[in-house]
Amino acid sequence: MNPAPNLVMVGPMGAGKSCIGRRLAERFGLEFVDVDQAIVEQVGSSIPAIFAQHGEAGFRQHEADTLQALLEQDNKLISTGGGTVLDPHNRQRICARGFVVHLHVSVPTQLTRLARDRNRPLLQRADREQLLHAMAAHRTPLYHEVADLSLETDHFSPAEATAQLVLRLAAQWRMSSAPA
Protein backbone atom coordinates (compact mmCIF):
# COMPACT_ATOMS: atom_id res chain seq x y z
CA MET A 1 0.00 0.00 0.00
CA ASN A 2 1.21 3.44 -0.90
CA PRO A 3 -0.44 6.05 1.34
CA ALA A 4 -0.98 9.51 -0.13
CA PRO A 5 -3.44 12.33 0.66
CA ASN A 6 -4.48 12.87 -2.98
CA LEU A 7 -4.89 11.06 -6.28
CA VAL A 8 -3.18 12.79 -9.20
CA MET A 9 -3.93 11.96 -12.83
CA VAL A 10 -1.15 12.50 -15.39
CA GLY A 11 -0.94 11.71 -19.08
CA PRO A 12 -1.29 13.23 -22.51
CA MET A 13 -4.29 15.19 -23.69
CA GLY A 14 -7.06 12.87 -24.79
CA ALA A 15 -6.08 10.06 -22.41
CA GLY A 16 -9.22 10.53 -20.31
CA LYS A 17 -7.79 12.24 -17.21
CA SER A 18 -10.80 14.50 -16.64
CA CYS A 19 -13.54 12.05 -17.64
CA ILE A 20 -12.10 9.09 -15.75
CA GLY A 21 -10.91 11.35 -12.93
CA ARG A 22 -14.44 12.60 -12.24
CA ARG A 23 -15.68 9.01 -12.00
CA LEU A 24 -12.84 7.97 -9.68
CA ALA A 25 -13.36 11.03 -7.48
CA GLU A 26 -17.01 10.12 -7.04
CA ARG A 27 -16.14 6.49 -6.32
CA PHE A 28 -13.53 7.38 -3.66
CA GLY A 29 -15.33 10.40 -2.17
CA LEU A 30 -12.69 12.90 -3.31
CA GLU A 31 -13.14 16.42 -4.61
CA PHE A 32 -12.38 16.48 -8.35
CA VAL A 33 -10.25 19.39 -9.56
CA ASP A 34 -9.10 19.90 -13.14
CA VAL A 35 -5.96 22.08 -13.01
CA ASP A 36 -6.71 23.74 -16.36
CA GLN A 37 -10.25 24.62 -15.25
CA ALA A 38 -8.93 25.96 -11.93
CA ILE A 39 -6.52 28.21 -13.86
CA VAL A 40 -9.36 29.49 -16.07
CA GLU A 41 -11.43 30.32 -12.98
CA GLN A 42 -8.54 32.05 -11.19
CA VAL A 43 -7.29 34.06 -14.17
CA GLY A 44 -10.70 34.78 -15.66
CA SER A 45 -9.56 33.90 -19.19
CA SER A 46 -9.70 30.80 -21.36
CA ILE A 47 -6.60 28.67 -21.88
CA PRO A 48 -6.21 29.94 -25.48
CA ALA A 49 -6.49 33.54 -24.22
CA ILE A 50 -3.87 32.91 -21.51
CA PHE A 51 -1.52 31.45 -24.15
CA ALA A 52 -2.18 34.44 -26.44
CA GLN A 53 -1.59 37.01 -23.68
CA HIS A 54 1.22 35.38 -21.68
CA GLY A 55 2.64 32.65 -23.93
CA GLU A 56 3.26 29.08 -22.90
CA ALA A 57 5.73 30.18 -20.19
CA GLY A 58 3.08 32.38 -18.56
CA PHE A 59 0.57 29.57 -18.67
CA ARG A 60 3.08 27.12 -17.17
CA GLN A 61 3.68 29.51 -14.25
CA HIS A 62 -0.07 29.67 -13.55
CA GLU A 63 -0.12 25.88 -13.78
CA ALA A 64 2.73 25.45 -11.27
CA ASP A 65 1.16 27.91 -8.80
CA THR A 66 -2.27 26.28 -9.07
CA LEU A 67 -0.87 22.76 -8.72
CA GLN A 68 1.13 23.72 -5.63
CA ALA A 69 -1.94 25.25 -3.96
CA LEU A 70 -4.05 22.17 -4.72
CA LEU A 71 -1.42 19.73 -3.49
CA GLU A 72 -1.22 21.54 -0.15
CA GLN A 73 -4.75 20.24 0.47
CA ASP A 74 -5.98 16.69 1.09
CA ASN A 75 -8.72 14.47 -0.34
CA LYS A 76 -8.49 15.77 -3.90
CA LEU A 77 -8.40 14.01 -7.22
CA ILE A 78 -6.29 16.36 -9.31
CA SER A 79 -6.40 16.07 -13.09
CA THR A 80 -3.26 17.71 -14.47
CA GLY A 81 -2.59 19.13 -17.90
CA GLY A 82 -0.51 17.04 -20.27
CA GLY A 83 2.52 19.31 -19.89
CA THR A 84 2.48 19.60 -16.11
CA VAL A 85 5.26 17.01 -15.83
CA LEU A 86 7.65 19.15 -17.89
CA ASP A 87 8.55 21.15 -14.77
CA PRO A 88 10.80 19.15 -12.40
CA HIS A 89 9.33 21.02 -9.40
CA ASN A 90 5.84 19.91 -10.44
CA ARG A 91 7.04 16.31 -10.69
CA GLN A 92 8.55 16.50 -7.21
CA ARG A 93 5.38 18.03 -5.73
CA ILE A 94 3.13 15.48 -7.42
CA CYS A 95 5.16 12.56 -6.07
CA ALA A 96 5.38 14.05 -2.58
CA ARG A 97 1.65 14.70 -2.17
CA GLY A 98 -0.16 12.25 -4.40
CA PHE A 99 -0.62 8.72 -5.56
CA VAL A 100 0.00 9.22 -9.27
CA VAL A 101 -2.10 7.51 -11.92
CA HIS A 102 -0.71 7.68 -15.45
CA LEU A 103 -3.24 7.27 -18.24
CA HIS A 104 -1.61 6.42 -21.55
CA VAL A 105 -3.15 6.76 -25.00
CA SER A 106 -1.73 6.18 -28.48
CA VAL A 107 -1.36 9.06 -30.93
CA PRO A 108 -3.97 7.64 -33.36
CA THR A 109 -6.50 7.45 -30.52
CA GLN A 110 -5.56 10.97 -29.40
CA LEU A 111 -6.21 12.27 -32.91
CA THR A 112 -9.64 10.65 -32.93
CA ARG A 113 -10.58 11.89 -29.46
CA LEU A 114 -9.29 15.43 -30.05
CA ALA A 115 -10.48 15.86 -33.65
CA ARG A 116 -13.02 18.59 -32.86
CA ASP A 117 -11.28 20.14 -29.85
CA ARG A 118 -10.41 23.80 -30.46
CA ASN A 119 -9.55 24.60 -26.84
CA ARG A 120 -5.99 23.28 -26.92
CA PRO A 121 -3.63 26.00 -28.15
CA LEU A 122 -0.73 23.63 -28.78
CA LEU A 123 -2.86 21.66 -31.28
CA GLN A 124 -4.04 24.54 -33.43
CA ARG A 125 -1.69 23.65 -36.26
CA ALA A 126 -1.69 21.56 -39.40
CA ASP A 127 0.94 19.09 -38.19
CA ARG A 128 -1.03 17.81 -35.19
CA GLU A 129 0.02 14.19 -35.63
CA GLN A 130 3.74 15.00 -35.80
CA LEU A 131 3.38 17.30 -32.80
CA LEU A 132 1.62 14.61 -30.75
CA HIS A 133 4.35 12.08 -31.61
CA ALA A 134 7.04 14.59 -30.55
CA MET A 135 5.20 15.40 -27.32
CA ALA A 136 4.80 11.69 -26.54
CA ALA A 137 8.50 11.04 -27.12
CA HIS A 138 9.43 13.84 -24.72
CA ARG A 139 6.72 13.47 -22.06
CA THR A 140 6.10 9.71 -21.78
CA PRO A 141 9.35 9.06 -19.85
CA LEU A 142 8.33 11.86 -17.44
CA TYR A 143 4.89 10.31 -16.90
CA HIS A 144 6.57 6.97 -16.15
CA GLU A 145 8.97 8.71 -13.74
CA VAL A 146 6.15 9.95 -11.52
CA ALA A 147 3.60 7.13 -11.96
CA ASP A 148 2.61 4.82 -9.14
CA LEU A 149 0.15 3.07 -11.46
CA SER A 150 -0.35 3.17 -15.26
CA LEU A 151 -3.26 2.24 -17.49
CA GLU A 152 -3.50 2.17 -21.28
CA THR A 153 -6.88 3.74 -22.18
CA ASP A 154 -7.02 3.12 -25.94
CA HIS A 155 -9.36 0.13 -25.78
CA PHE A 156 -11.40 1.03 -22.70
CA SER A 157 -14.53 3.12 -22.39
CA PRO A 158 -14.40 5.62 -19.50
CA ALA A 159 -16.55 3.25 -17.42
CA GLU A 160 -14.28 0.27 -18.17
CA ALA A 161 -11.12 2.26 -17.43
CA THR A 162 -12.64 3.48 -14.16
CA ALA A 163 -13.54 -0.08 -13.13
CA GLN A 164 -9.98 -1.25 -13.88
CA LEU A 165 -8.52 1.60 -11.85
CA VAL A 166 -10.87 1.08 -8.90
CA LEU A 167 -9.65 -2.51 -8.58
CA ARG A 168 -5.99 -1.56 -8.91
CA LEU A 169 -6.25 1.43 -6.58
CA ALA A 170 -7.97 -0.69 -3.93
CA ALA A 171 -4.91 -2.96 -3.95
CA GLN A 172 -2.21 -0.28 -4.19
CA TRP A 173 -3.37 3.00 -2.62
CA ARG A 174 -4.53 4.04 0.79
CA MET A 175 -5.74 7.58 1.31
CA SER A 176 -3.88 9.29 4.11
CA SER A 177 -3.79 12.73 5.58
CA ALA A 178 -0.56 14.64 5.55
CA PRO A 179 1.52 14.59 8.72
CA ALA A 180 0.70 17.50 11.01
UniProtKB/Swiss-Prot annotation:
Pathway: Metabolic intermediate biosynthesis; chorismate biosynthesis; chorismate from D-erythrose 4-phosphate and phosphoenolpyruvate: step 5/7. One of its GO terms (biological process) is chorismate biosynthetic process. Transmembrane segments: none annotated. Gene3D superfamilies: P-loop containing nucleotide triphosphate hydrolases. InterPro entries: P-loop_NTPase, Shikimate/glucono_kinase, Shikimate_kinase/TSH1, Shikimate_kinase_CS. Substrate binds at residues 36, 60, 82, 139. Binds 1 Mg(2+) ion per subunit. GO terms for molecular function: ATP binding; magnesium ion binding; shikimate kinase activity. Mg(2+) binds at residue 18. Its EC number is 2.7.1.71. Disulfide bonds: none annotated. The keyword ATP-binding applies. ATP binds at residues 14-19, 120. Belongs to the shikimate kinase family. Monomer. This is Shikimate kinase. It comes from Xanthomonas oryzae pv. oryzae (strain KACC10331 / KXO85). The lineage of its organism: Bacteria, Pseudomonadati, Pseudomonadota, Gammaproteobacteria, Lysobacterales. The gene is aroK.
